[in-house]
């Protein structure tokens, strides 16, 4: 990265975004619905109090009977009959309205939307000791977003203080912390709570999350918001454990390691790799970049935000909204180039090749960096400084396949052993296309990881038949190939809130999408996906091993928004409590 961009990674948001928590809402419908139903909830509470009083009298009578009983009663108490009563008392503890797994963008966004809808008794289970999700974990040199900051943020919580058009990871993490403070979310978050099992209890109509330490947390609904980019992935290379030098994954960066003068390799030339290489080449002795497949790289129109922009955004919030809309529609246009094979696809490829030719002079290197697949088939990369970094005197691009790791380095298929002090794995994440990060159990012993062995499927990326009251974020086929993930996320959050309110306000035991509705939805999706660039023949993390696309949404962001705009109750089976 250039000097301006790298310095932005150390910057912090100096002022909080000019939006108040109670003003930050775009959809007041759910909130009004809850307020209107408040009297009914009070009446329900009174009934519950009366029931509790009756229950207490019954318990008192039983206690008196116990005191008056003889040895037979004592024997009865020691045979384990008291234990079920203890368990029953534990189950009577009021469950949360919603269990949210994960405190990254998705989990916090879900919490905000629930609060704005009048639901406050939810709990967020976070496995780490801080919020942030992928932006907490990815702190490698040069880490930044490849979507403009004014689009990679929530529309209901704009930040007029972005320092650059493309912000670094530190600044994005500051924005996430702002969300926690502005919407008073920290009291809802339980840190260091790693969920190991999520099971639906059909009789009670509750979800139970089992934590690593054995504790069970219960909720009427559950939201899986752990995100697809949370588990670091290492390549399946022979001898991985044999290398005696330092091994670092891009998502688990070791800031104590001194790269100065070291012999370093970077494996992986995807989104994280092209950000790491320009930073490491500045300090290492030698840098060897191991490339399996070149990607399409386009320029990044990055610039420092002028102070007058910030002042304008603060004084006239509508001006920032207009900028966001302009960015949104610009990216929507890109869909024609990267999702489908259209005349714009060829235009995009020519622009990318022009970028390559303008920055790389050597013919051999140009050929090695030219993709042989259609643009959009893999993730399009955005960088101004990756190509120049590869041409530094201490850098070398290696395209021979890796045969294995050796104790002192990497051995390639041409028989050369590259001596190294450190290997950086910029190999991305174990994206859950056919499984789940922990067992998720639904009705009648169903397990989501088993059902998704052939590829993940859901209804509108949110609900899965047989798993009532469960809502997914970044679920199957919700990935954008051209626009901001948070645009898609907002549609998911609002849809999930509608479902959760239907369960809570309707006093439902279960709300489960119909199996035939889900199957019909996915047949249509896969038919549309077959015509996209993602399914045009290259190997990418979008697809399973057998070519099933469980990741991307085959359309414009506006089409996804329309899909999520209506909650069709006829698509679900509702079971009253």
Region roles according to the model:
Residues 3-5, 10-91:
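Intrinsically disordered, polybasic Lys/Arg-rich low-complexity tracts
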Residues 159-178, 190, 267, 339-347, ...:
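Short beta-strand to alpha-helix junction loop
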């Amino acid at each position: 990265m250039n000097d301006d961009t790298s310095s932005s990674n150390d910057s912090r948001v100096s002022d909080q975004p000019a939006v108040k928590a109670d003003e930050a809402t775009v959809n007041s419908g759910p909130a009004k619905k809850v307020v209107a139903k408040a009297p009914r909830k009070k009446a329900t509470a009174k009934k519950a109090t009366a029931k509790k009083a009756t229950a207490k009298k019954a318990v008192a009578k039983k206690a008196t009977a116990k005191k008056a009983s003889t040895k037979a009663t004592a024997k009865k108490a020691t045979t384990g009959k008291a234990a079920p009563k203890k368990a029953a008392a534990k189950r009577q503890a009021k469950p949360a309205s919603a269990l949210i797994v994960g405190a990254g963008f998705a989990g916090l966004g879900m919490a905000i939307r629930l609060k704005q809808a009048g639901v406050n008794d939810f709990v967020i289970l976070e496995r780490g000791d801080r919020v942030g999700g992928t932006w907490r974990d990815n702190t490698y040199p040069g880490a930044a977003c490849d979507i403009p900051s004014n689009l990679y943020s929530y529309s209901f919580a704009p930040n007029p203080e972005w320092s650059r058009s493309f912000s670094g990871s530190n600044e994005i993490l500051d924005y996430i912390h702002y969300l926690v403070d502005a919407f008073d979310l920290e009291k809802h978050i339980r840190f260091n709570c790693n969920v190991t099992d999520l099971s639906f209890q059909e009789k009670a109509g509750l979800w139970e999350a089992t934590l690593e330490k054995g504790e069970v947390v219960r909720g009427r609904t559950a939201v899986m918001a752990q995100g697809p980019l949370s588990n670091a992935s290492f390549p399946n290379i022979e001898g991985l454990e044999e290398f005696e030098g330092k091994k670092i994954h891009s998502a688990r960066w070791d800031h104590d390691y001194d790269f100065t003068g070291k012999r370093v390799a970077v494996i992986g030339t995807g989104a994280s790799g092209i950000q790491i290489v320009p930073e490491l080449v500045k300090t290492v002795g030698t840098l060897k970049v191991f490339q399996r497949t070149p990607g399409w790289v386009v320029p990044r129109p990055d610039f420092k935000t002028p102070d007058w922009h910030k002042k304008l955004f603060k004084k006239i919030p509508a001006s920032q909204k207009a900028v966001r809309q302009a960015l949104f529609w610009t990216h929507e246009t890109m869909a024609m180039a990267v999702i489908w094979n259209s005349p714009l696809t060829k235009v995009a490829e020519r622009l990318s090749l022009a970028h390559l030719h303008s920055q790389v002079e050597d013919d051999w290197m140009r050929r090695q960096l030219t993709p042989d697949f259609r643009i959009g088939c893999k993730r399009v990369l955005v960088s101004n400084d990756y190509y120049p970094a590869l041409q530094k005197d201490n850098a070398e691009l290696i395209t021979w396949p890796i045969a294995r790791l050796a104790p002192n380095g990497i051995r390639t298929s041409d028989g050369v052993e590259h001596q190294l002090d450190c290997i950086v794995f910029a190999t991305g994440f174990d994206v859950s296309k056919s499984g789940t990060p922990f067992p998720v159990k639904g009705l009648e012993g169903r397990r989501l990881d088993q059902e998704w062995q052939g590829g993940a499927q859901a209804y509108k990326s949110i609900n899965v038949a047989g798993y009532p009251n469960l809502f997914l974020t970044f679920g199957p086929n919700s990935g954008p190939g051209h626009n901001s993930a948070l645009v898609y996320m907002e549609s998911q959050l609002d849809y999930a809130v509608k479902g959760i309110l239907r369960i809570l306000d309707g006093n439902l035991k279960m709300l489960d999408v119909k199996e035939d509705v889900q199957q019909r939805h996915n047949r249509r999706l896969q038919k549309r996906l077959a015509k996209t660039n993602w399914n045009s023949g290259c190997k990418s993390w979008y697809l399973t091993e057998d070519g099933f696309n469980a990741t991307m949404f085959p359309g414009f962001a506006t089409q996804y928004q329309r899909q999520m705009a209506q909650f069709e109750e006829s698509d679900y089976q509702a079971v009253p409590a």
